[in-house]
């Protein structure tokens, strides 16, 4: 072996096989488009689960779909469905500040409303080592879980600060970010600006 040559370790990325009943949406899928219009979410890249009437949010890693989360459009339970469970979180946006929220819609809408933020939906799970790997890639962290989870918000702030050493702030909101409440969006924006 030549001197200086290094072995290359390639990360194997699991790829999700998309079920046949998860399709590209068409204009005739009124429940799908009504859902997107209600939340003011763009349809780009989203799919539709015709079997269970779900809006499907794919999760990508290095250009490959590794998981997807489906949101029930007609009251089918569970409301949120994980297709593989391989992805620890859903990300939206591309800022250096990480905003941790609970669900996909809150992540998408926060990224739309707040510049220079990446939103991470933890998808109803507890924080784990995989989450911390992702969190460690950012310059600071804001935790803004649903209002009924204030204790969990404070707990996550402590865990993240201890685990990563990053500046981490807990934010108490009046409602989920997905509802676009002006006070909540302004609170998050102010915390982004003043925590630099």
Residue ranges with predicted function:
Residues 36, 49-138:
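Phosphate-handling DNA/RNA-contact segment within nucleic-acid enzymes
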Residues 29-32, 65, 182-185:
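Alpha-helix initiation and N-capping motif
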Residues 95-98, 106-196:
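TOPRIM fold recognition
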Residues 1-62, 92-93, 193-196:
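TOPRIM metal-binding catalytic domain and adjacent DNA-binding surface shared by DnaG-type primases
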Residues 6, 20, 24, 86, ...:
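Residue-identity detector for glutamine
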């Amino acid at each position: 072996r030549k001197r200086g040559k290094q072995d290359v370790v390639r990360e194997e990325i699991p790829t999700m096989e998309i079920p046949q009943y998860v399709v590209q949406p068409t204009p005739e899928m009124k429940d799908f488009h009504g859902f997107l219009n209600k939340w003011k979410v763009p349809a780009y890249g989203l799919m539709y689960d015709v079997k269970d009437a779900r809006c499907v949010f794919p999760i990508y890693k290095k250009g490959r779909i590794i998981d997807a989360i489906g949101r029930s459009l007609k009251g089918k339970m569970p409301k949120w469905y994980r297709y593989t469970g391989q992805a620890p979180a859903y990300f939206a946006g591309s800022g250096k500040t990480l905003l941790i929220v609970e669900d996909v819609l809150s992540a998408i809408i926060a990224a739309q409303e707040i510049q220079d933020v990446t939103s991470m939906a933890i998808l109803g799970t507890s924080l784990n080592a995989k989450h911390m790997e992702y969190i460690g890639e950012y310059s600071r962290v804001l935790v803004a879980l649903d209002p009924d989870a204030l204790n969990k918000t404070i707990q996550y702030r402590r865990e993240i600060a201890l685990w990563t050493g990053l500046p981490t702030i807990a934010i108490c909101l009046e409602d989920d970010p997905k509802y676009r409440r002006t006070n909540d969006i302004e609170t998050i924006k102010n915390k982004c600006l003043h925590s630099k």
